[in-house]
């Protein structure tokens, strides 16, 4: 078959597929609109840089997992706030029945516009998510959490009944159904997950996430979030030092990490990240305990500089802009971004 005949045959096949399944069902990759991946900021400057595209990708499945009280829900509430700032409509499937509206509001979430559902079963939660995603009107949906998506058979059964892998089967079936709708509607779908210990593991990490392996495969981005220390004001604990690692990334190189502070009552401290990244990139000068920007001293001690940046948002925004512009250089400054 000559090249001309091949081209005619392909054109005829493409026309037939479009006639059967609608315009846009098949095309050449270069003709596809929005080849560049759009992203929504995570609310953390360091994590945006670690993700490689300035945030979480639209139209993809994201998994955020970690131990208890590590900041999983805080991070997702920041995601919602950032999406709403960009005019997005968000939904929160609260399977754990534990969302605190007052805390969400403090983190910048417009709770009057946030759609919330507190389903009784895992099937109900995933059906609600599927309906909202297929509507095309939702920009971001959070499912909190995979561990709380209890199958109906387990709820209706006796307390001691063995329900072998029923949750894993439920997740596998749901993700097969959801994945095409998520991509088509450009909806960011975030699953929060918990950690469990595997019994009898001699080598390697004994940790695993709940709900089987399906989510590990379908997720484009997997973020591991851990609390690594406390932030104290004299004797009072006022926040936690947090480390996140992008353990899977289909849109950029994986295994990059970021550190940030989560302050109780106000969430991720952007000012703290601006200071740390600014010093690493030599945008902010540090001499002993003093910090300076453009040869002008801006404070003594990290907490005082954080307060200065809060009171002078124009300077904070200016430094943040320079950090984002230099973000390509950050990969060379080793934020522990390669797997050890």
From Swiss-Prot:
Its main location: cytoplasm. It holds the Pfam family RecA. It is found in: Cytoplasm. One of its GO terms (biological process) is SOS response. Belongs to the RecA family. NCBIfam families: tigrfam_recA. Can catalyze the hydrolysis of ATP in the presence of single-stranded DNA, the ATP-dependent uptake of single-stranded DNA by duplex DNA, and the ATP-dependent hybridization of homologous single-stranded DNAs. It interacts with LexA causing its activation and leading to its autocatalytic cleavage. This is Protein RecA. The lineage of its organism: Bacteria, Pseudomonadati, Pseudomonadota, Alphaproteobacteria, Rickettsiales. The gene is recA.
